[in-house]
Amino acid sequence: MLVYLAEYLTQFYSGFNVFSYVTFRAILGLLTALVFSLWWGPILIKHLQTLQIGQVVRDDGPESHFSKRGTPTMGGILILAGIFISVLLWGDLSNRYVLVTLFVLASFGVIGFIDDYRKVVKKDSKGLIARWKYALQSIAALVVAVYLYSSSTMVGETQLVVPFFKDIMPQLGFMFILLAYFTIVGASNAVNLTDGLDGLAIMPTVMVAAAFALIAYLSGHAQFASYLHLPHLPLAGELVIVCTAMVGAGLGFLWFNTYPAQVFMGDVGSLALGAALGVIAILVRQEILLVIMGGVFVMETVSVILQVGSYKLRGQRIFRMAPIHHHYELKGWPEPRVIVRFWIISLFLVLLGLATLKLR
């Protein structure tokens, strides 16, 4: 909103023109979301404690997790509020890429909220029934996928960018909808599965969001996009604001979510953040790069698929427990060691993903 005010005030004082620069607003967006999260975090935690909205811990999980029972959850509300306020202040709300991303954050946030509400308030350990959760995710994802396909006006908006190959950019056509659907739903559930230890999911999310901020800026800049053989997407530049807001809100939340956690994000946070990363990857045409940079999320998801598949087909489990972070806990790794090592893996994969922009 302040973009429009600054644009109006520029006619009276040229200094307000600084707000027309995406980089300047991105910094302000990050700081706004960060300060908001740090300021309101203690207030939200106290309120959640008063309402007795505490984490439900499964009885068959690692014994070290029993102490987490009752820790305030649904802290993802803090993250989403920080992102929304920051983007509403510093983003260009006439940009359809920004609006689509906000819609995804809101819709998947609502799905996660319903799931959390049933678990911690209604005391239903299963939360939202799996088929209903998947159905709601599918509806939201398909709405976005169909809209993006039908509203595309440039060839680059529906091309598939293949890392390491500068000349391979096949036109997806109607398959774009299918790819977008699986990217959004898959990323949403992958981050949700990863969110099992203190700070484990939020830091990789912050790293990937920061990387996408850079990619969005490069894709929105004609010269940089041409130099790096990326599709030039003029609207992508404004996604930098969304990405840096995610970084700021995520770091602010990590202040309270780091081991030992004072609050958990819950499904309201993990489902929304994962879906947001998915739709941003779609908008900047880097779905494959998301698989690389979000490798920790992929690893967690694959471990669950392998575990379930192996048990159903062979009656044997591959891991001591899935997702895989629990496997290492049961092997005797202290929780902080698992968390930090997964962070290091995530950092490596994000840097590897960024390197592919030049290695073509």
UniProtKB/Swiss-Prot annotation:
Q: Does the keyword Lipid metabolism apply?
A: no
Identify the cofactor(s).
Mg(2+)
What is one GO cellular-component annotation here?
A: plasma membrane
Might you give the EC number(s) for this enzyme? Answer: 2.7.8.13
According to its UniProt record, which reaction does this protein catalyse?
Answer: UDP-N-acetyl-alpha-D-muramoyl-L-alanyl-gamma-D-glutamyl-meso-2,6-diaminopimeloyl-D-alanyl-D-alanine + di-trans,octa-cis-undecaprenyl phosphate = di-trans,octa-cis-undecaprenyl diphospho-N-acetyl-alpha-D-muramoyl-L-alanyl-D-glutamyl-meso-2,6-diaminopimeloyl-D-alanyl-D-alanine + UMP
Pathway(s) of this molecule: Cell wall biogenesis; peptidoglycan biosynthesis
**Ranges annotated as spanning the membrane:** 26-46, 73-93, 97-117, 135-155, 168-188, 199-219, 236-256, 263-283, 288-308, 338-358
GO molecular function (one): phospho-N-acetylmuramoyl-pentapeptide-transferase activity
Q: Name one GO biological process term.
A: peptidoglycan biosynthetic process
Places the protein is found: Cell inner membrane
Keywords assigned by UniProt, alphabetized: Cell cycle, Cell division, Cell inner membrane, Cell membrane, Cell shape, Cell wall biogenesis/degradation, Magnesium, Membrane, Metal-binding, Peptidoglycan synthesis, Transferase, Transmembrane, Transmembrane helix
Enumerate the InterPro entries for this protein: Glycosyl_transferase_4, PNAcMuramoyl-5peptid_Trfase, PNAcMuramoyl-5peptid_Trfase_CS
What is the membrane topology noted in the UniProt record heading this document? Multi-pass membrane protein
Q: Which Pfam families match?
A: Glycos_transf_4 (PF00953), MraY_sig1 (PF10555)
Please classify the protein's predominant subcellular localization into one broad category.
Answer: membrane
Q: Which domain of life is it from?
A: Bacteria
The record, for PANTHER family, names: PHOSPHO-N-ACETYLMURAMOYL-PENTAPEPTIDE-TRANSFERASE (PTHR22926), PHOSPHO-N-ACETYLMURAMOYL-PENTAPEPTIDE-TRANSFERASE HOMOLOG (PTHR22926:SF5)
Which family is it part of?
Belongs to the glycosyltransferase 4 family. MraY subfamily.
Per its UniProt record, what HAMAP family does this chain match? MraY
Function of the protein: Catalyzes the initial step of the lipid cycle reactions in the biosynthesis of the cell wall peptidoglycan: transfers peptidoglycan precursor phospho-MurNAc-pentapeptide from UDP-MurNAc-pentapeptide onto the lipid carrier undecaprenyl phosphate, yielding undecaprenyl-pyrophosphoryl-MurNAc-pentapeptide, known as lipid I.
Tell me what this protein is called.
Phospho-N-acetylmuramoyl-pentapeptide-transferase
Name of the gene = mraY
